[in-house]
């Protein structure tokens, strides 16, 4: 079984098992020149054109950007779409209620008519990827300031986009790669009618929940099925009962053969973001300062939500998707810190930097151009640490994890729009804000949100420099429970009364009412401090950082050895990774196999547990060893 594609690996852009380290996230249109020979030597029987082609069907035509935040794969000629359970979790949750709890019970449509629409969900296909670097950097000069450079690049991007001939329903996006040293245009088409077809219960699709997230061995049945629908002409169309299942240019065939150690495997998808080429000081600050602060905030937020969800089944449904979203990066940051510490990543980076500096010193031209870049970049990180850490904490508490504060921030922005642009500006923003807030309120519990506000604002003074703490918080630090309770009681945001004002009042009346709202006043105090003391100075430092990082990246590309594997950081664009399936040894005396089985699920099973419960039906199948054609030597692969 040497040369099969593993659909399981395609479904998850990053491997849970270990690849035989051919690291990289490569641009599909460049595989023939960069990677094809190596891939074929490793066992791939396809060609680069089988993976990426413009004028005929190829693997890329079966890979979609699912909702703009995940990867999905078309696995039938009727638009059936496979993705992860956690990627479809928000949609599954949105269709759940106490009476019809799809999260707990799962869902399987018995016909096309039973498939459930998901407003706002889309599937985007990449049609073509083109290198447009010379066009985007046309007229960009070394003597330009960073602002002049960015202004010129933005103008060039708009000019280039206007010159592309796009088909119906197509769009063009131009993305920076290698920290702004290269640019690629991505032509795509978006389908907006994507319906839920099937999902296992969370005790399978989310088995192990946060304890097992981002770690191995994993026993989660992390999958869900959707279907793309199109108009009668197979072109994108808004939801309609008249739409029909989409016929793709290519779909992935399903194999029941599984994978063996040593099999070649290909990963195709849309990874979010990475920072492969940071200097050592950035990694050090991330591990020691920024990640711990973000983890501390989310520790507190998750504890509040977890208690509320365990005590109230309705809250459990309301907050399931939010909890999973917050927990995902919380666990990732914890694992990131653990991995970077265990692998001595900072010391390894410093060794690379010594070698980098040595190469520069051996070439006068390189030294003249890039000799001071790394020193300046390190100085930039030292000067910006407290600002970047404070920005992260502020974002976690005020802009993300407390919805009452978040909505108050939007109202404060609406008031600013009115003060600057009058009735027209108010109505323009309000028309977008109302449906957004209505969507937030669908899964909002004022009591839970109030407790989140109290808990996180209690942590705020401990995580921020004193000068970044608004006086209203420092003065009420020892009585935040009552202080915040009174604000939530008097505010029109937790009660949803704000929607009536936005919908029914004239702009002037609405502004007069809303500018006196306690939560709006509180957030306005935060926002004034944030913009003056954090955002403005940080913006200047970040502009300098972006320039230095671009030069540092250019220098790394310039001095790299011929066989160096320098791939661009992930930026939510289509990429390819590849390697061989293997287990790995994370530490002394521990070896992980390449595959897990249902036996491991039952070993972890804890009856009634929040994370490790198992459905009765699955227990019965396990006890009867009733695995149908899916067994592997009498065992059921997960």
Predicted regions and their residues:
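Bacterial N-terminal signal peptides that target proteins for export
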Residues: 1-8
């Amino acid at each position: 079984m040497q040369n099969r594609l593993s659909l399981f690996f395609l479904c998850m852009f990053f491997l849970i098992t270990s690849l035989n380290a051919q690291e990289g996230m490569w641009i599909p249109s460049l595989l023939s020149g960069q990677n094809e020979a190596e891939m074929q030597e490793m066992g791939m029987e396809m060609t680069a054109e089988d993976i990426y082609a413009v004028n005929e069907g190829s693997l890329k035509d079966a890979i979609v950007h699912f909702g703009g935040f995940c990867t999905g794969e078309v696995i039938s000629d009727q638009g059936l779409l496979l993705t992860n359970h956690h990627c479809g979790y928000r949609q599954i949750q949105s269709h759940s209620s106490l009476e019809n709890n799809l999260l707990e019970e799962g869902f399987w449509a018995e016909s096309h008519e039973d498939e459930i629409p998901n407003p706002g969900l889309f599937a985007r296909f990449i049609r073509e990827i083109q290198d447009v670097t010379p066009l985007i950097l046309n007229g960009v000069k070394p003597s330009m300031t960073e602002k002049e450079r960015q202004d010129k690049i933005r103008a060039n991007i708009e000019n280039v986009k206007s010159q592309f001939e796009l088909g119906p329903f197509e769009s063009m996006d131009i993305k920076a790669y290698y920290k702004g040293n290269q640019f690629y245009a991505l032509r795509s088409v978006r389908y907006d009618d994507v319906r839920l077809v099937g999902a296992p219960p969370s005790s399978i699709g989310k088995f192990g929940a946060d304890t097992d997230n981002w770690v191995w061995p994993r026993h989660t049945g992390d999958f869900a099925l959707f279907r793309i629908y199109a108009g009668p002409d197979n072109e994108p169309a808004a939801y309609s009962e008249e739409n029909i299942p989409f016929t793709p240019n290519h779909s992935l065939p399903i194999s029941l053969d599984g994978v063996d150690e040593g099999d070649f495997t290909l990963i195709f998808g849309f990874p979010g973001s990475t920072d492969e080429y940071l200097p050592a000081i950035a990694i050090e600050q991330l591990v020691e300062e920024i990640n711990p602060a973000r983890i501390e905030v989310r520790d507190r937020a998750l504890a509040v939500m977890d208690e509320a969800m365990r005590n109230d089944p309705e809250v459990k449904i309301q907050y399931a998707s939010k909890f999973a979203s917050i927990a995902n990066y919380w666990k990732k940051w914890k694992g990131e810190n653990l991995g970077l510490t265990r692998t001595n990543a900072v010391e390894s980076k410093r060794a690379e930097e010594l070698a980098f500096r040595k190469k520069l010193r051996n070439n006068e031209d390189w030294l003249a151009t890039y000799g001071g870049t790394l020193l300046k970049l390190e100085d930039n990180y030292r000067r910006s640490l407290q600002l970047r850490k404070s920005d992260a904490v502020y974002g976690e508490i005020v802009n993300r994890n407390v919805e009452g504060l978040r909505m108050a921030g939007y109202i404060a922005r609406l008031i600013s729009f009115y003060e600057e642009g009058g009735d027209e500006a108010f109505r323009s923003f309000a028309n977008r804000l109302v449906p957004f807030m209505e969507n937030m309120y669908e899964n909002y519990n004022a009591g839970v949100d109030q407790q989140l506000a109290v808990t996180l604002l209690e942590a705020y003074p401990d995580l921020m420099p004193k000068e970044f703490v608004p006086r209203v918080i420092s003065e009420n630090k020892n009585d935040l429970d009552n202080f915040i309770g009174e604000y939530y009681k008097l505010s029109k945001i937790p009660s949803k009364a704000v929607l009536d004002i936005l919908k029914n009042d004239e702009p002037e009346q609405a502004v007069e009412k809303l500018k006196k709202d306690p939560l709006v006043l509180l957030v306005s105090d935060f926002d004034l401090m944030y913009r003056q003391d954090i955002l403005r100075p940080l913006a200047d430092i970040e502009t300098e950082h972006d320039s230095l990082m671009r030069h540092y990246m250019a220098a790394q590309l310039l001095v790299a050895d011929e066989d160096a594997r320098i791939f661009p950081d992930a930026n939510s664009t289509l990429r390819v990774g590849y390697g061989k399936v293997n287990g790995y040894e994370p530490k002394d005396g521990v070896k992980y196999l390449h595959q897990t089985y249902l036996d491991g699920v039952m070993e972890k099973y804890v009856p009634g547990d929040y994370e490790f419960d198992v459905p009765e039906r699955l227990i019965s199948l396990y006890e009867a060893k009733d695995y149908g054609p899916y067994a592997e030597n009498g065992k059921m692969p997960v």
